[in-house]
Amino acid sequence: MAEKPQLVNNLPEDVETDECMNKYTHIYSPDLLSDQVAFITGGGSGIGFRIAEVLMRHGCDTVIASRNLEKISQAAKKLTSTTGRRCLPIAMDVRQPETILAAVDETLKTFGRVDILINNAAGNFLCPATSLSFNAFKTVMEIDTMGTFNTSKVIYDKWFKDHGGSIVNISATLGYRGQALQVHAGSAKAANDAMTRHLAVEWGPSGVRVNTVAPGPISGTEGYRRLGGSHAETAGAFHSIPLQRAGNKTEMAHAVLFLASRASSYVTGSVLVADGGAWLTSANDVERLLGIVSSRSAKL
């Protein structure tokens, strides 16, 4: 049974779990993305799942690509059942270009086009730099940064170069001021922000727009759980955020929808920060973050 959506203080509906909403209020025309196709990495859960749902509720068919075929196949069934649009699950590893080539070929064979690319696949965890292994740092860079470039390049070469399109990268604000315990993810996301600008310049003449959404703390996500969101909420840390709360997944999906659609037709090379103002005011509390890491280690 679907979880009851939350609608508080005019916030958009959302559910904490990786389930579709049983009610959705459109803020754009329901046919905004009519008959377009979106390719979404990491689309089987969290923000990626909600992005897929919201795009599909605006007339878009989707491809959700991830390493876990069983998980994304279940997600695809939910998305199609709720929205009535097609959703193709494809097993793919963003670190392996040959799997991306095969996935894009299957997408073009099935749908005949790709209009939107959402680079959402990512990996993150809290870890002091002194405890971070060489392999752990490398893995995050490979998934977040190399994965974004690999997927963007394949889709550009196979479709966007001749037909145009919109790329939206999912980033973070970690690198804006040097977030404690996040040298791996902060470095990867900073590289992605630079990549957004470079590709916007190079691919603009082909009719390709490249933009980024940088979320803050978003409830109902694996990142929220891994990065101490519940602990921060309990400790009252969100009071330092200008909007006094965490965001929800639908709010992030709406930011992506704006950048992916013709609503932002003259926007490229931009980073849209969707964090309630958190990075402007939140304390970079090293002791609190280290406390979260220590408490988790003690439970293992």
Swiss-Prot record:
Superkingdom, taxonomy of origin: Eukaryota
Binding site for substrate: 67, 95, 125, 133-135, 226
Enzyme Commission number: 1.3.1.124
Assigned keywords, A-Z: Fatty acid metabolism, Lipid metabolism, NADP, Oxidoreductase, Peroxisome
GO molecular function terms listed in the Swiss-Prot or TrEMBL record: 2,4-dienoyl-CoA reductase (NADPH) activity
Catalytic activity: a (2E,4Z)-dienoyl-CoA + NADPH + H(+) = a 4,5-saturated-(3E)-enoyl-CoA + NADP(+); a (2E,4E)-dienoyl-CoA + NADPH + H(+) = a 4,5-saturated-(3E)-enoyl-CoA + NADP(+); (2E,4E)-hexadienoyl-CoA + NADPH + H(+) = (3E)-hexenoyl-CoA + NADP(+); (2E,4E)-decadienoyl-CoA + NADPH + H(+) = (3E)-decenoyl-CoA + NADP(+)
Record motif Microbody targeting signal, residues: 298-300
Main location per the UniProt record: other
Record localization: Peroxisome
Residues given in the record as NADP(+) binding sites: 42-47, 67-71, 93, 189, 215-221
A GO biological-process term: fatty acid metabolic process
A single GO cellular-component term on record: peroxisome
Summary of the function given for this chain in its UniProt record: Auxiliary enzyme of beta-oxidation. Participates in the degradation of unsaturated fatty enoyl-CoA esters having double bonds in both even- and odd-numbered positions in peroxisome. Catalyzes the NADP-dependent reduction of 2,4-dienoyl-CoA to yield trans-3-enoyl-CoA.
Subunit-structure text: Monomer, dimer and oligomer.
Similarity comment text for this entry: Belongs to the short-chain dehydrogenases/reductases (SDR) family. 2,4-dienoyl-CoA reductase subfamily.
Full protein name: Peroxisomal 2,4-dienoyl-CoA reductase [(3E)-enoyl-CoA-producing]
